[in-house]
Design a protein with these regions (language model features):
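A short SAM/SAH-binding and catalytic strip from SAM-dependent methyltransferases
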Residues: 117-131
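Conserved class I S-adenosyl-L-methionine
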Residues: 2-56, 69-73, 90-93, 148-182
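C-terminal lobe and adjacent flexible extensions of AdoMet/dcAdoMet transferase-like proteins
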Residues: 207-250
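Class I SAM-dependent methyltransferase SAM/SAH-binding core
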Residues: 61-63, 67-108
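Short alpha-helix
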Residues: 183-184, 195-218
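A short acidic, Gly/Pro-enriched loop at the edge of an enzyme's catalytic core
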Residues: 108-119
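A short glycine-rich, Lys/Arg-flanked "PGG" loop and its adjoining helix->strand segment in the class I
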Residues: 132-147
Length: 250
């Protein structure tokens, strides 16, 4: 299950009236519409994932595969792919084309060690509370010299209290909010909301390093020009980071 990368500015603070989703199956229909209808995945996310992923003869795992959109996309370029997710309703879509497993990240107890060539996640890492366990578990199941690819909303974007503001000269700047502190926000999702966990970039890289992952490539990217043209409210944010993509080597 992924969170729409564009509508994060609609997030409310944890003391808001919207309760976080407990059963992800209740928003499965909403997610199918979001995944199919948001061109940002094709325009901005797919090129980043293509750059970070590498062909491998060992199995590839999509961590939080949802309905399997990235599993189907990967078939064009890289090797055998499987998926896991907490939503049985979305896995029912993904299983039509790929092997899948019901799981609750960060646990990968259903997998034996040294099983995968690559693991990747797209807009799922922000939903995992314990990132130390995430990096340790993925490190357990990926072979030596294997890789981990993570694409997330940029931590500058997920920090509670962050957001754009315009000065008297009409220049757009970014308010950092509580960037240096770990925190949470609730993001509207269908009739409910999901809890997103904010960590600074330094926290993320340190946690990965402590689990034995070596940083190989990191990409910071703004919202693409096509998305900004479609929604003029994003004008002035062309140089503000919106996405972070990282590849680590085991």
């Amino acid at each position: 299950m992924e969170v729409d990368p564009i509508h994060g500015e609609n997030a409310v603070r944890p003391d808001g009236a919207t309760a976080p989703v407990v059963d992800w199956d209740t928003i499965a229909d909403w997610w199918r519409g979001e995944a199919a209808g948001d061109p940002v995945y094709r325009e901005d996310v797919a090129p980043m994932l293509s750059r970070l992923m590498e062909p491998t003869t060992a199995p590839i795992l999509d961590l939080g595969c949802g309905d399997g959109q990235w599993l189907r996309w990967l078939d064009r370029d890289v090797g055998r792919a499987i998926g896991c997710d907490r939503s049985g309703a979305l896995l029912a879509d993904a299983v039509a084309t790929h092997p899948v497993a019901l799981c609750e990240l960060p646990s990968l107890a259903w997998l034996q060690g040294q099983t995968l060539g690559t693991a990747f996640s797209v807009f799922v890492f922000d939903l995992v509370e314990n990132i130390d366990e995430f990096f340790a578990e993925v490190g357990r199941v990926v072979v030596r010299d294997g890789s981990l690819v993570v694409i997330i909303n940029h931590p500058a974007f997920t920090a509670p209290g962050s957001g754009p503001f315009m000065d008297p000269d009409l220049d757009v700047f970014w308010r950092w909010g509580e960037y240096l502190e770990r925190g949470t926000s609730l993001v509207p999702a269908g009739s409910g909301a999901v809890k997103m966990y904010h960590r600074s970039t330094g926290d993320i890289l340190t946690s990965a390093a402590q689990a034995g992952w070596q940083l190989e490539e990191m990409i910071e990217a703004p919202l693409g020009s096509a998305a900004i043209e479609r929604d003029p409210s994003y004008a002035g944010q062309e140089d503000i980071p919106r996405f972070l993509g990282v590849r680590w080597r085991r």
